[in-house]
């Protein structure tokens, strides 16, 4: 019997642990990526073949390439390692008729298109900020008259806070829509809901959430992305009532959206105005910015590795979570003024990971108590802001 073959869409340099786990489980691993990424430090020992193309984002070219290669290489699973790969991977699954082994194009929209996300969440009884599509002028005018500002004009398919504009008047909203031109229809407008932003990092098996870790951002990502500053997130104390409430909403989203099997990073806002939880966005992938490293040191679960196991056992075999730890961890990350910042003065024993990326500084810390994690993050954020932090204007698109 031939080994199971995994085709991984890799539009960004990430997911090495996923590929290594697939290989360790005996799979044949194909990594499909843009030409410019083939020289990155991939775990080539775990990749049977790198398929690199200069036309990675052209759907017909991708299908032609994979169809030709598929004459001699069977593809049993098609996986998207990054947010921007989700739609193309779904398109390929539809083409190869593997929609029973991952998201098809309709369900993939719920994990990429913020307008589709909100409509679906609302239909299954999950609270969302007030929103409107940008297709019809009269609907927009009605929305702006009915819903108090400020408002956010958001790209429907960008990741994180890229491209979001905060508008304080209806005039600003219309000006932003005019600036978008033909891209206007690929945006939405929603009310700004001030609050505390949480993210849930999950694993799903057979349509049910089997692992969910609730984490809290230091401040909303929009504030960090557009105002500069230092990014931080941490394990939220597991005995707090917010954790149970957010897990309930998270399960509604992932099970209602039809993820089926895999990993997810989902965000909720606890609103200052009413204490209720509002769904912000979800995804069908592992969170970025060292989130997976943080979760692993807090729980013992490596999201990339466990996601690989879940993909492998879709049609046969049983999946079991590894033993869980009950520790706490946090991440702090910032752009740096220095190309290679000297972090030797950060010497606390709780540091379990140091970011190695030009013009960036970052750490993952882990401890037995949430108080110690918060103490370290607060100290590091202050030092980084003072001695290292660099601020660039917020971009309209995420740059890989």
What are the language-model segments listed below?
Residues 1-105, 138, 369-370, 378-398:
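ATP-binding N-terminal substructure of ATP-dependent carboxylate-amine bond-forming enzymes
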Residues 5, 15, 140, 306-400:
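Peripheral (often C-terminal) accessory segments that flank ATP-dependent C-N-forming ligase machineries
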Residues 61, 139-143, 172:
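Short acidic active-site motifs
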Residues 68-75, 145-147, 181-183:
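Glycine-rich phosphate-binding loop signature in dinucleotide/nucleotide-binding domains
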Residues 94-163:
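A conserved helix-loop-beta module that forms one wall/lid of the active-site cleft
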Residues 127-129, 150-153, 162-199, 226-232, ...:
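Conserved ATP-binding module of the ATP-grasp superfamily
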Residues 134, 164-169, 203-205, 365-366:
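Short beta-strand-to-turn element immediately C-terminal to the catalytic PLP-Schiff-base lysine
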Residues 171, 191-259, 263, 270, ...:
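ATP-dependent carboxylate/phosphate-activation module, predominantly the ATP-grasp catalytic core
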């Amino acid at each position: 019997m031939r080994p199971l073959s995994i085709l991984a869409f890799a539009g960004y340099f990430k997911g090495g642990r996923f590929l290594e786990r697939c290989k360790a489980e005996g799979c044949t691993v194909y990594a499909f990526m843009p030409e410019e990424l083939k020289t990155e430090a991939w775990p080539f020992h775990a990749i049977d073949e790198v398929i690199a193309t200069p036309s990675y984002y052209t759907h017909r070219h991708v299908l032609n390439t994979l169809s030709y290669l598929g004459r001699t290489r069977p593809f049993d699973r098609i996986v998207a390692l990054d947010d921007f790969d989700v739609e193309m991977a779904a398109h390929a699954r539809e083409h190869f008729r593997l929609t029973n082994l991952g998201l098809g194009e309709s369900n993939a929209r719920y994990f990429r298109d913020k307008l589709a996300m909100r409509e679906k969440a609302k239909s299954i009884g999950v609270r969302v900020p007030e929103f409107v599509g940008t297709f019809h002028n009269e609907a927009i005018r009605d929305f702006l008259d009915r819903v108090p500002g400020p408002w956010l004009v958001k790209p429907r398919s960008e990741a994180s806070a890229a491209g979001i504009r905060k508008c304080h008047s209806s005039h600003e909203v219309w000006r932003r829509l005019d600036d978008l031109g033909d891209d206007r229809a690929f945006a939405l407008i929603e009310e700004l809901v001030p609050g505390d932003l949480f993210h849930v990092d999950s694993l799903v098996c057979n349509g049910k959430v089997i692992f969910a870790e609730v984490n809290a951002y230091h401040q909303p990502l929009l504030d960090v992305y557009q105002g500069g500053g230092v990014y931080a997130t941490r394990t939220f104390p597991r005995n707090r009532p917010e954790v149970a409430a957010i897990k309930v909403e998270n399960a509604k989203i992932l099970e209602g959206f039809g993820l089926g099997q895999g990993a997810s990073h989902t965000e909720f806002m606890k609103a200052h105005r009413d204490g209720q939880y509002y769904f912000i966005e979800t995804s069908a992938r592992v969170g970025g910015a060292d989130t997976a490293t943080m979760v692993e040191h807090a729980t013992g679960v490596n999201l990339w590795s466990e996601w690989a196991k879940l993909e492998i056992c879709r049609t046969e075999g049983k999946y079991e979570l590894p033993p869980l730890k009950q520790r706490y961890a946090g991440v702090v990350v910032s752009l740096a003024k220095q190309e290679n910042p000297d972090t030797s003065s950060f010497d606390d024993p709780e540091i379990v990971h140091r970011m190695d990326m030009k013009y960036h500084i970052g750490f993952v810390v882990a401890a037995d108590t949430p108080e110690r994690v918060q103490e370290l993050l607060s100290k590091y954020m202050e030092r980084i802001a003072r001695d290292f932090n660099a601020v660039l204007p917020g971009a309209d698109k995420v740059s890989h």
